[in-house]
Amino acid sequence: MENDKGQLVELYVPRKCSATNRIIKADDHASVQINVAKVDEEGRAIPGEYITYALSGYVRSRGESDDSLNRLAQNDGLLKNVWSYSR
C-alpha cells in the first residue's frame, strides 16, 4: 500500500526464496537472509555493495541451503569452479 506521497507504507513486505522462488511466509521462523559483500581486487569489502539471498525454512530443513547458495553465487559471478554432485 502507498500513501499520498507514493511511499511504501506496508508493515510487512513478503520475500521470495532465492533458491525456489516460493514466497516466505511471515511465520517461517527458520528462514534466513544472507548478505554477501562485493570485494575489490585486494579482497576488501566495498561499503554498501552486496548481494542479498533469502533462503526459506523449507530449503534449510532439507539440507539444500549450501548447494543453493553455491549455485546462486556462481550464477551471480561470485564463485568459480565449485564442485556439484548434479554436474
UniProtKB/Swiss-Prot annotation:
Subunit field text: Component of the small ribosomal subunit (SSU). Mature yeast ribosomes consist of a small (40S) and a large (60S) subunit. The 40S small subunit contains 1 molecule of ribosomal RNA (18S rRNA) and 33 different proteins (encoded by 57 genes). The large 60S subunit contains 3 rRNA molecules (25S, 5.8S and 5S rRNA) and 46 different proteins (encoded by 81 genes).
Described function: Component of the ribosome, a large ribonucleoprotein complex responsible for the synthesis of proteins in the cell. The small ribosomal subunit (SSU) binds messenger RNAs (mRNAs) and translates the encoded message by selecting cognate aminoacyl-transfer RNA (tRNA) molecules. The large subunit (LSU) contains the ribosomal catalytic site termed the peptidyl transferase center (PTC), which catalyzes the formation of peptide bonds, thereby polymerizing the amino acids delivered by tRNAs into a polypeptide chain.
Family: Belongs to the eukaryotic ribosomal protein eS21 family.
N-acetylmethionine sites (modified residues): M1
Protein name: Small ribosomal subunit protein eS21B
Pfam families: Ribosomal_S21e
Matching InterPro entries: Ribosomal_eS21 (IPR001931), Ribosomal_eS21_CS (IPR018279), Ribosomal_eS21_sf (IPR038579)
Miscellaneous note of the record: Present with 15300 molecules/cell in log phase SD medium. There are 2 genes for eS21 in yeast.
GO MF, any single term: structural constituent of ribosome
Phenotype caused by lack of the gene: Reduction in growth rate, a decrease in free 40S subunits, an increase in the amount of free 60S subunits and a decrease in polysome size.
Principal location: cytoplasm
UniProt-annotated location(s): Cytoplasm
GO cellular component, one term: cytosolic small ribosomal subunit
PTM info: N-terminally acetylated by acetyltransferase NatB.
Domain of life: Eukaryota
Keywords for this protein: Acetylation, Cytoplasm, Ribonucleoprotein, Ribosomal protein, rRNA processing
Gene Ontology terms describing biological process: endonucleolytic cleavage in ITS1 to separate SSU-rRNA from 5.8S rRNA and LSU-rRNA from tricistronic rRNA transcript (SSU-rRNA, 5.8S rRNA, LSU-rRNA); endonucleolytic cleavage to generate mature 3'-end of SSU-rRNA from (SSU-rRNA, 5.8S rRNA, LSU-rRNA); translation
PANTHER family attached to this UniProt entry: 40S RIBOSOMAL PROTEIN S21
